[in-house]
Amino acid sequence: MEDLFNALPQPLQQLSLALAGEIPLNDELFQAAASTWHTRQRSETYHLLDRLRFSTPIVTPQAIYRDLPWRNCYRINQDRVERIPTTNASDDVYVPNSDISTLLSPLFSIPTYGTLHPSIEKDALELRADSARCASTFYKIASSQARQVKLDPTRMLEFLLLLVATPRVNSGLDTDQPSMRDPTKSPALHAIWQIMQYYKVDSKYHAPALIVSTGAVWWIPPPGKRNVVSVQYLLTDLVNLAIIARMTDMHPTLGLCAARVYIQAATTDSYTHTLLKLKGVFPALSIHSMYRQKGFGGKAPDIQWTEPRTKYQFKWVGVTHLHDGLRPRAPVRDEAVRKLLTEYQLADIMAPIVEMRNQHKHHDHDSVRFVRDVMALTSGMYLVRQPTMSVLQEYSQVPDIKQPIPPSAWTGTVGNVRYLNKDVTGPARWLYNTWREAAQEIAQDRTWHDPVNQFIMGSQYVTARGGSGSSLKHSLTVTGLVLPEFSESSVKRSSKIYQAAQIARIPFTLLTAAIHAEVVMAIRNQVQRRARSIMPLNVVQQAVSAPHTLVANYINKHMNMSTTSGSVVTDKVVPLLLYASTPPRTVVNVDIKACDASITYDYFLSLICGAMHEGFEVGDNHASFMGVPSSIIMDKRSALAPYSRTVSGLQTMVQHLSQMYANGFRYSVTDAFSSGNKFSFPTSTFPSGSTATSTEHTANNSTMMSYFLAVHAPQHIKSPNMKRVLSDMTIQRNYVCQGDDGVLLLPDEAASKISAEDMDELLTCLKDYGTSFGWVYDIDWSDSAEYLKLFALCGCRVPNVSRHPPVGKEYASPTTDEIWPSLIDIVVGHHLNGVMDLMNWREWLRFSWAFACYASRGAYTDKYGETHIAQYPWWTFVYLGIPPILLPGQTPFIHSLFMPPGDQAMFAILNNWRDLISTNTTTTFPPLKHPHHTWHLADVPTLLDSYGVYAGYHAAQHPRRPVAQPETANSESIEQITGALTDYLLYDPILKARVNTGRHNWSQLSQSIGLNIGGRVPSLMDVPGKWVAAGREAEKPPPSAIVYMFKSLNRTIRRPSKHFSKLLELYIRVKVVLGAPKPLAIDPDIPQVAGADPHNDDPWFKYVGLGDIPTSTRRYFGESLFVGRVVSGLDVEAVDAALLRLKILGAPPAAYIALLNGIGMSNSEANQIAGRVSLANAQTVQIGRVVNLSTPSSWMTLDTAPYIQYHTYDFKPGVTNPSAQSREKFIWLSPILKLLCATAAMSIAGPVREAYVLDIHGSAASLSGNFREWMRAA
């Protein structure tokens, strides 16, 4: 690649060498490369491709430049701009492959590029001209589709070429295999080069679009050429494919198949619609059709699901030796795929994939890597659709209920609800009884009579996110109610925080009109799925939804025991997926199509509201709930003797909830992508923005499956074998679901798989059953497991790489102007995705550093024309979790991607570098006059300062969002909104009294000199201020705040203090050494995660050394907490750490009670929790939190707990300095030292090794004293 290297400017050549491990990275090199990139024209990247002599069979036809006139794709209907399908598919409503050039007006700064002509937008807005409105819609939605990227794809392409330009240095590990595939054989790169020849004018390349901070600007071609928008999307997908192919070491044949699909999509009427139709091709040819030939073999784990199953704990008990008797029974998908591909003239791409697939008869590292690579071929583009079309298509659906509930099934009305008659049977009765019994349990549970638990429920939707605030205000204004305004507080007006403050002092009885307010549209773009419109409810609607959430949570936790919602995929029972996919088990993936639209008042919601209301009858009918008082309703169950009666606050909420569901919602649509598209749309679809949505769908999903397994299937299945299987099945043991997604686990049938005929009968029965109540079950039986977009095959997790595209990023709003430092967080998130997806780690690390270099530099021009520039040092990214490639004096690529971020990263680096920098310091700088607390007389701080370590360290902790400045808000308005939120929080006098008592008692105790337990603990009174701060941060920052951020960041970088945080200074007093590799936890021949194999050595070492985590991480970390739930705005882990801190500091029981009272807990609950706080029984992760040590997300799928317990040593006789041994009274110090040992070991590439504390500078006693001093000041 010498030609390519020579074509780079000198600063980028130096960066290329550093990324290869030839030379250490330093700030001078880093900043010069970043500066070069930011002044270098993007078109230069395509000239670099000229240096590669490609030799691939890829051909890009001229048909990709054909023009489907945009005028043929849009129309005005009912005064709305709507997309007209140009094919027979009704969902063909995505961006058309049309020429955009005729709509452009040249930019002054770049005349060859342009944006929408002002006259078109003016005619669309002012004259409402049909043609102009259609043109404007096409331009805006096409530009939005182009903008769904982290960065201009051209820049990402150049990062890749920088890696290719210099071969990587061998790291020295025996397993390092530096040979990578030749880039001249890359079909993706070759296709990019071919396409760009069309965009080459006068020897200069012009990308179809340039992505800028505010969106996209489009090339204005010379006469005779077009600029078809789909070519930009095609280039984005090809760049993404080229990166993934390099990072996975993908076979070029597979890359060719993907490139063919993308190119063919560009020749159709709509690129994105075609990709949506073809998204299932590559999974169908790989994970859904593996191992169907005779000769099946290999090894899989033997996993047991331990009792009780509700804990979701699993155990590896050995190896399953695979054979033909365990071969998958589900049919291959080849014929269906062939038919689909033939429709798009792509049938020939099937043969090479099938041929490669059939070579993998054994389940091993190579076969699962093949599966991972084929699945990665699916386009990872975020798909954009005109919001108007999302609403018209998604919110007009009505379920087809084959067996509706007859009017005779109901009693007379009880206010706004009806109860189900006793003689009704079938799934309706089963559903009704489940919800009624759960409601009874809630009504009788004294826990929910406690105001703090009620407010925990009521605080979960008080966030900085928007939620139909304007319609809330309008609905109340109509009734004559004037809401207070806090306009000068700078809190985002559309946020639910602002709404909560507005209604804080208004009785619920005056707010009921807001329950029927319109719901304002929001939008989400997704990968490989249609764009989704969201219905965010206002705070009053969310409040009356609380009983729905509460009862559903009870059903999920105590009755059906399904998984509950959460945002991190590793919280979603990964071990369950591995267990389910391991032969001889049979697993069926069950999804409910259009679940929101299928949950309507005609069936589900009328049953649920009636059942909850009846169940709540057992409670106190005069009791209020969440500030909602009891009320009087008319009970007409007896037509002859109707009567009025009092119902509780919970029942009153259900009355309003039932009326809200019965009326349906009016969806207020303001389509920012379509000029003039503002309309109100009635819908019966369940509101996707409700806090109840996920948990209520889960409860219904599991309840209906419960009836199927217990009653319906045994009555309708004919097969004796299947009847026997069903007799042992329950949802608690055999069905796990969340929302509309489920996994059905069929028990082993005498150590062999259930026959295909029996499976077909069962699945047909399930589909027919769903139609009786309006559900369409989308059933996938492929002998692989899929749950919540996670995949597993024969006990091996298969990362779905295409779901985390290196290039792609969602931008749902048409205004996408972001403040630059946010790109730093995008880099870090992008890096972590590659770690979790098991990319080839050294190449991924190189790519991450190239991206980090570009992102490290930013500029902002203020209104006076002054440009402010800031440049992050390279050590900033080390602190944020990207390991260095090469440090002075070390071997390249010795630091692992499993290195934690933050102070733990710095400890790991400095611990490993300690001896080298100490030696370098003594030969470079004079000794210190006074001994340093860690480095003795060596002036290591000056050396670290010269390396830029301190500058990068402190810059990393500088805010990357402009901080709301005091002068940007009126202090009186801030006080008013804070006071209103305080009243919203402490609405209950009992809760208010507890908090005040707790604060008073804590104040008395903390001021006691004899106790010396510190002065700061979490309190409910912190919450209003945190809400205000979050609301202000969500608002678009003023220019003055942006300028201040740039200036403040530059001050931090230029004049950093020559020390770390107090905690890190204490960490580095501990010297950790690594011993021999620990014994393997897993047979190295068993694939655990596709991509963690000898070709990708460090992840493989970590997985075989530690094994998969055997339990749900959510449950593991949840059970390590003394306090289960706290009010939104408080950090449950911070409360937990504060309790342990008090234990370490020897605080009396009264201090725990005061702290817990201060967060709203009663004396009885506080006493129970205080009694559980024990250092002896605390888990390592709990004590680690006290001093800010944590388990990073990259460890979450690994079984690190046994390693930390048995293979890290805070004291090793004969190895550890005796003064470093902690005394028995310092029992809490041992877990901290063990976590530091684990941090050091996991941060080194290679086998997982035992780790020991060699020495502690000063002694263990002095270190514990310093930690306690820090705790008092924290």
Swiss-Prot record:
Pfam family membership, one: RdRP_5
InterPro entries from the UniProt entry: DNA/RNA_pol_sf, RdRP_5, RNA-dir_pol_reovirus
Keyword annotations of the record: Hydrolase, Nucleotide-binding, Nucleotidyltransferase, RNA-directed RNA polymerase, Transferase, Viral RNA replication, Virion
Keyword Cell membrane: no
The reaction(s) this protein catalyses: RNA(n) + a ribonucleoside 5'-triphosphate = RNA(n+1) + diphosphate
Sequence ranges assigned to domain RdRp catalytic in this UniProt record: 550-798
Keyword Transport: no
Gene Ontology molecular functions: hydrolase activity; nucleotide binding; RNA binding; RNA-directed RNA polymerase activity
Uppermost EC category: transferase
Gene3D superfamilies in the record: RNA-directed RNA polymerase lambda-3
Localization of this protein: Virion
Annotated EC: 2.7.7.48
An example Gene Ontology CC term for this record: viral nucleocapsid
Domain of life per record: Viruses
Function as written in the Swiss-Prot or TrEMBL entry: RNA-directed RNA polymerase that is involved in transcription and genome replication. Following infection, it catalyzes the synthesis of fully conservative plus strands. After core assembly, which consists in recruitment of one capped plus-strand for each genomic segments and polymerase complexes, the polymerase switches mode and catalyzes the synthesis of complementary minus-strands.
Family named by the database record: Belongs to the reoviridae RNA-directed RNA polymerase family.
Official protein name in the record: RNA-directed RNA polymerase VP2
Record organism: Aquareovirus G (isolate American grass carp/USA/PB01-155/-)
Lineage: Viruses, Riboviria, Orthornavirae, Duplornaviricota, Resentoviricetes
Underlying gene: S2
